[in-house]
Curated annotation (Swiss-Prot):
Primary subcellular site in the record, as a coarse category: nucleus
A molecular function GO annotation: protein kinase binding
Gene: spdya-b
Oligomer status and interactors: Interacts with cdk2. Interacts independently with cdk1 and with the cyclin B proteins ccnb1 and ccnb2, but doesn't interact with a cdc2-cyclin B complex. Prior to oocyte maturation, the mRNA is found in a complex with dazl and pum2 proteins; pum2 dissociates from the complex during maturation.
Protein family: Belongs to the Speedy/Ringo family.
Protein name, as recorded: Speedy protein 1-B
Species this protein is from: Xenopus laevis (African clawed frog)
Length: 298
């Protein structure tokens, strides 16, 4: 009797051990005849295709009209005219401002110049690679004491961002939807020139162009826009005979003397180091025997 009880107890122990191994899913254990239970509800859910939810702003006419009235504000008009290159206020950035107003749930009475500059600054934060240009917004929004108050401005930006539930990404399709409501409005005709697309290399930057100017000062002259306007008008920027001479003549006058402009056909290896030597003009063009003179190092 005692032997039978011990045998039964051993069987129970062995049986419980097997259950534990199965429960743990031992990799070498395979149970024959076991099938996974089918759940019809899961099969139906898996068969349904994924539907991408498209969100619409659903801008009301009164909201669009209030925004257009805001754009006619004298300060904003002067600011937009200052941005002649459309680096910080092209049509897509302005469309993002209106989208931000809608997402933040602003009433039309809250369509103010300060909220405009805050939203425009946030739009530049999200979309623009060149971060220095957006600092021009500070003196327009804060006045002459912008150096003292710009930390508060950045807090306003963060609060505005939080009011939108941090949904600051606006797709191009959404911007096109905003502009399609009133496609002939002048704000949606502010196309950025192609020569101002993309980022600018550090050695091509003029540090004076990044310092905020603010109201009352003329915008910095842009050599690229000037040359493009001359070409668009059918004129000739310079009467040099060769394109290379035209490039050098133009850039030497417009850019800093510390900037070296190379011909477009000259390719340099960015991993290599080059020594630059500046030469003077030769004293005489040719030797009596026709051999060319060497240039003199400075």
């Amino acid at each position: 009797m005692r032997h039978m009880q011990s045998a039964t107890r051993a069987t129970l122990v062995c049986g419980s051990g097997v259950k534990q191994i199965i429960a743990k899913g031992h990799p070498n254990t395979r149970v024959f005849g076991a099938r996974k239970a089918r759940i019809p509800e899961r099969e139906v859910l898996a068969a349904k295709p994924k539907i991408t939810r498209i969100t619409h702003l659903n801008l009301q006419p009164q909201e669009r009209q209030a925004f257009y009235r805001l754009l006619e504000n004298e300060l904003i008009q002067e600011f937009l005219s200052m941005d002649s290159c459309l680096k910080i206020s092209d049509k897509y950035l302005i469309a993002m401002v209106l989208a931000y107003f809608k997402r933040a749930g602003l009433y039309t009475g809250e369509y103010t110049t300060m909220n405009f500059f805050v939203a425009l600054y946030l739009a530049n934060d999200m979309e623009e690679d060149e971060e220095d240009y957006k600092y021009e917004i500070f003196p327009w929004a804060l006045g002459d004491s912008w150096r003292e108050f710009f930390p508060q401005f950045l807090r306003l930006r963060d609060n505005f961002w939080a009011k939108m539930n941090y949904r600051a990404v606006v797709s191009r399709r959404c911007c096109d939807e905003v502009m399609a409501k009133d496609p002939t409005h002048w704000a949606w005709l502010r196309d950025r020139p192609i020569h101002h697309s993309g980022a600018l290399r550090g050695y091509l930057r003029n540090e004076d162009d990044f310092f905020p100017r603010g109201p009352g000062l003329t915008p910095a002259s842009c050599a690229l826009c000037h040359k493009a306007s001359v070409c668009d008008s059918g004129g000739v920027a310079h009467d040099n005979s060769s394109p290379e001479q035209e490039i050098f003549h133009y850039t030497n006058r417009e850019w800093s003397q510390e900037l070296l402009i190379l011909p477009p056909e000259l390719l340099l290896d960015p991993e290599s180091t080059y020594d630059i030597h500046i030469f003077q003009e030769p004293l005489v063009g040719l030797e009596p025997d026709g051999a060319a003179l060497e240039w003199h190092h400075l």
